[in-house]
A protein has these predicted regions:
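Positively charged, solvent-exposed patches that mediate nucleic-acid binding
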Residues: 1-113
Length: 113
């Protein structure tokens, strides 16, 4: 599980990321990033009911993505805030494709050390 200090949870933080963050796209999600914040890197995950009506499937997508971010956390620059807005195509993706997409978008955003 992603440590509490590395989670974004406040609605205000997500709104700020959407408004001020740099957007990176993938077939499975949009990723918004703000750099230059104080403290450790923090991440959030948004999977709306539009992606899947079933909470079990939405939670599964969040778990897969959280696990990959947690694996990459030691190599992520501190002071970054990022949020993943999951798209409908992610529900049909398999684990390796989704995990590779998370890794790829973080590399594209130069979030990895």
């Amino acid at each position: 599980m992603l440590p509490r200090e590395n989670r974004l949870s406040a609605e205000f933080d997500f709104r700020r990321l959407r408004r001020e963050g740099r957007r990176y796209g993938s077939p499975f999600f949009n990723f918004f990033l703000i750099s230059g914040q104080k403290g450790p890197a923090r991440f959030g995950f948004v999977v709306s009911a539009r992606v899947s009506k079933r909470a079990v499937r939405r939670n599964r997508l969040k778990r897969i993505m959280r696990a990959e971010v947690e694996n990459l956390l030691p190599g992520i620059r501190p002071g970054l805030w990022g949020a993943f807005w999951v798209r409908e195509a992610a529900e049909r993706a398999n684990h390796p494709a989704l995990r590779q997409s998370v890794r790829g978008i973080l590399q594209e955003a130069k979030a990895l050390l």
